[in-house]
Design a protein with these regions (language model features):
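N-terminal auxiliary segments of SAM/dcSAM-dependent transferases
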Residues: 1-143
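Conserved alpha-helix/loop element of class I SAM-dependent methyltransferases that forms part
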Residues: 146-150, 164-180
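Conserved class I S-adenosyl-L-methionine
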Residues: 178-189
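Conserved SAM-binding loop of SAM-dependent methyltransferases across substrates and taxa
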Residues: 188-200
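Conserved SAM-binding motif I beta-strand of class I
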Residues: 203-208
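S-adenosyl-L-methionine
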Residues: 210-249, 261
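A conserved beta-strand element that flanks and buttresses the S-adenosyl-L-methionine
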Residues: 255
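C-terminal substrate-binding/active-site "lid" region of AdoMet-derived donor-dependent transferases
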Residues: 260-336
Length: 336
């Protein structure tokens, strides 16, 4: 009998609650993101705007749950810490929004344009927050007004957009960039622009394999950059560049953004982590790393559970917590 069984069972319970919550949130965002609208919000808050976050969280918990116990769990353990009313004006003051004009243009299968969030439409605005007990909090935001944002479409499908999620998830990485920077993945140049604006950044090398994306950027966006001379674009596969060219360059920092979400990000993340040793002087940073590590964490935990059930695991629970920590996983994936 595993001696720390109660602790393991509690962690497994939290994992299952995380999964239940995230399935419900995914269904909401994919199918009914405008479940709450201006009329509903006015009705439930009674005109008191200070109550909007609380009311949004409570309404969401009730709507996404199947019973009272679930509603209480969702509201108390997740949405109370998760839901945030965002300021549209604050995002409009973002340097990229203020200084870069995205024209409505179509080149081949690619198109530059705009999309909008409607008042009280829900969306993920930042990476997850992982609590000490490994409860994972999704960051759900909303605006009280229409908010438009630039978007790149491929064959009519959103490929990249400068939404609050991109801004917030990239913000801590932008702050850490200095010296000579390598950026894997171009998008529509948001990260490159924000880093390029920093006085402590000497150069920005962007690695992008899609020539159409590069052409769009060079024709319509790069000319609007103030310090264009700091930008170098390399058309290359990211992993080939990291393996063969990057070690020669001695970059100070690298930011990796090669995926759309966790579903296609885990394998790419692991591939790049294994190449870090080729450039030991470079500090690597990864987009939505917390969410990617969450996916890996629970796969590791499932393996530990199986070993416990078969009697092949006797390490204390403190070791389990260590194996599931971000710091441990960041190093562990290099050897998978």
């Amino acid at each position: 009998m595993y001696k720390d069984r109660k602790s393991i069972d509690l962690l497994n319970k939290i994992k299952e609650e995380n999964f239940l919550l995230f399935r419900s949130v995914a269904a909401y965002l994919n199918e009914f993101p405008c479940l709450i609208n201006k009329e509903i919000m006015e009705e439930i808050v009674g005109g008191v705007s200070e109550n909007e976050e609380f009311s949004f969280a409570l309404f969401l918990a009730t709507a996404l749950s199947e019973n009272d116990d679930e509603a209480k769990l969702f509201e108390r353990e997740y949405f109370k810490k998760s839901v945030k009313k965002l300021s549209a004006d604050e995002y409009r003051e973002n340097p990229y929004f203020k200084n870069i004009v995205i024209p409505r243009k179509k080149v081949s299968t690619w198109e530059l344009g705009y999309q909008s969030y409607q008042p009280y439409e829900g969306f993920i605005y930042d990476d997850i927050e992982v609590m000490e007990n490994y409860r994972e909090i999704p960051k759900i935001g909303f605006f009280s007004e229409v908010f438009s944002f630039p978007t790149v479409f491929e064959d009519g499908v959103e490929w990249m957009a400068i939404k609050p999620n991109e801004i917030e998830t990239m913000k801590p990485h932008v702050e850490k960039m200095s010296g000579d920077v390598c950026v894997f993945g171009l998008g529509i140049g948001y990260f490159a622009y924000m880093v390029n604006e920093k006085t402590d950044v000497n150069s920005v090398t962007i690695v992008e394999r899609d020539s159409s994306v590069i052409n769009l950027f060079e024709k319509y966006i790069l000319p609007q950059f103030k310090n264009k001379d700091k930008i170098t674009i390399v058309k290359s596969d990211a992993f080939e560049f990291a393996k063969k060219e990057m070690p020669k360059k001695r970059f100070d920092c690298a930011f990796v953004d090669l995926w759309h979400d966790v579903s296609d990000g885990v394998d790419l993340y692991i591939r790049m982590k294994k190449l870090e040793s080729n450039s030991p002087s470079t500090k690597f940073y990864y987009w939505i790393e917390k969410s990617i590590l969450s996916n890996i964490r629970w796969h590791i935990f499932e393996g530990i559970l199986k070993r416990i059930e078969s009697g092949n695991f006797s390490e204390p629970f403190e070791n389990v917590k260590k194996y599931l920590s971000d710091d441990y996983l960041k190093n562990f994936v290099k050897f998978i």
